Amino acid sequence: MSWNNLHPGLVMILFGFIILALPEKCRKYLTLAGAVCAFCSFWMMDSHSTLPYKVTDNLTLQLIDTNGVSMVFLMVFVTIGVINAIYAMDLQNKWEAGITCIYAGSNMGIVLAGDLLSFIVFWEISAFASTYIIYAR
């Protein structure tokens, strides 16, 4: 895997799980760091990036398959993620911050999905995270 194929959605999901595992005082900086890292990985991608992941001999997941339209939508989602991280630095608790990062990352994964199975997996992660965010209030 080269650096121009670093998945911004998986970066945000990873930071979301790290936020959930670490103490509360690390939350605000990790939320912003995750969004900035996802933004940087977006800028390293080109409009023809691919990231296949071979599960078995017969099954290969296409985690990244970009074109011009997906890059525009990804730019919107990454920018919203950074703005959300800046806005929410003092408003959320640890669980809301972690799940919000997971939600943002799964939405980026939906945009970048190159096959139906990857799309459905990221969609279900997004559905779980959004349900938690709604019922957390």
Regions from the PLM with identified roles:
Residues M1-G98:
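Transmembrane helix-loop-helix hairpins at membrane boundaries of multipass inner-membrane proteins
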Residues G98-R137:
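Alpha-helical multi-pass transmembrane bundles of energy-transducing inner-membrane proteins
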